[in-house]
Amino acid sequence: MIGELTAALGIRDKLFLATKVWTRGKENGIKSMERSMTLLRAKQIDLMQVHNLVDVQTQLATLREWKAQGRIRYLGITHYEAGAFADVEKIMRSEKLDFVQINYSLMEREAEASILPLAQERGIAVIVNRPFGGGDLFSRARSKPLPDWAAEFGCRSWAQFFLKWIVANSAVTCAIPATNKPHHLEENLQAGAGPLPDGKMRQRMAELVSSL
């Protein structure tokens, strides 16, 4: 669908296309990535990621080849559990990565210990998944009013509150909240507009969520 839409609208040059490979074996990896390129109708993918570190060394070897050939612009790895951070960190230290995608939220802050500082040190861009803690943050905030002081940094909803806390971290490049509702998508996008909370305000936000 994305490939059809970008082709029909002629907007490929305005998009950053990112996808992933999630299989074992070199040939299977190549088939998976070529299928993604076909579906996206793209001669070049901006970012290809080894998802959940599956056969990571094999797939990274292919990604390095593809990057040299110009078939992808950037390469990276992903995981969605803090339990994998030790392995993620090892790869960040041993491989030349452009991106790392990890879970990080007001309820899952383990990435602050080593992953985020290391990403800044090595110049690795960070994509945040599970920015709402798998929905647990909304469960905490349900029926709770958004604090008046959230307006100081342009927040009009809890979703924007949670997202702005994340993207205000200087180590974070972007967050990717999942949704299948257009009005939620529009609301989430607004978190990237306007002012962001500073360090003191982020601490205040974290303390509030901890008290919910």
Task: Kindly give the residue locations of the regions a language model identified.
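Short Asp/Glu-rich motifs
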Residues: 1, 85-86, 138-139
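Short, solvent-exposed turn/loop segments enriched in Gly/Ser/Thr/Pro and often Arg
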Residues: 1, 78-81, 132
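N-terminal binding-site loop/beta-alpha segment at the start of enzyme catalytic domains
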Residues: 1-15
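Glycine/proline-rich, positively charged
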Residues: 9, 23-110, 114, 120-127, ...
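Extended hydrophobic secondary-structure segments that form protein cores and membrane-embedded regions
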Residues: 17-20
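Structured C-terminal cap/extension of enzyme domains
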Residues: 94-99, 114-212
